[in-house]
């Protein structure tokens, strides 16, 4: 098992609020999956809810190696929590297909948020031997030898 992708994102919550005021439902529809959309309308602090999902989806797209482009959209990533409250990701459509092609078998998600910012990190793991990545296992040894 090897790390195949790492992505991180930090979001200023006030920026999400500004975009939400300016764009309204268009922004929400672009970011949230149908399940998240239902949850969003049940939240007391909907801006924080939206900011967390925005950060996680940006981080996940970076971990895939694409960012939000090339057919990968925010709505293709869905944040949910397991029975213990641990954040998890569910991938849909092109994001799920790309994860299968890259043999990603495990996903790790972590979130941190404060009053003004929210931060997310996503790590994808899988079998490196079944990927196209050209890794030189001892590249660092030649860098540190005198």
From Swiss-Prot:
Main function: Transfers the 4'-phosphopantetheine moiety from coenzyme A to a Ser of acyl-carrier-protein.
Main subcellular localisation: cytoplasm
Reactions performed catalytically: apo-[ACP] + CoA = holo-[ACP] + adenosine 3',5'-bisphosphate + H(+)
Keywords for the protein's UniProt record, in alphabetical order: Cytoplasm, Fatty acid biosynthesis, Fatty acid metabolism, Lipid biosynthesis, Lipid metabolism, Magnesium, Metal-binding, Transferase
Similarity comment: Belongs to the P-Pant transferase superfamily. AcpS family.
Cofactor: Mg(2+)
GO cellular component: cytoplasm
Lineage top rank: taxon: Bacteria
Protein name from the UniProt record: Holo-[acyl-carrier-protein] synthase
Residues that bind Mg(2+): 9, 58
Pfam families: ACPS
Species per Swiss-Prot/TrEMBL record: Baumannia cicadellinicola subsp. Homalodisca coagulata
Enzyme's top EC category: transferase
NCBIfam families the record matches: acpS, pantethn_trn
Subcellular compartments: Cytoplasm
Transmembrane in keyword set: no
Phylogenetic lineage: Bacteria, Pseudomonadati, Pseudomonadota, Gammaproteobacteria, Candidatus Palibaumannia
Biological process annotations from GO: fatty acid biosynthetic process
Entry EC no(s): 2.7.8.7
Coiled coil start-end: none
One of the record's GO molecular function terms: holo-[acyl-carrier-protein] synthase activity
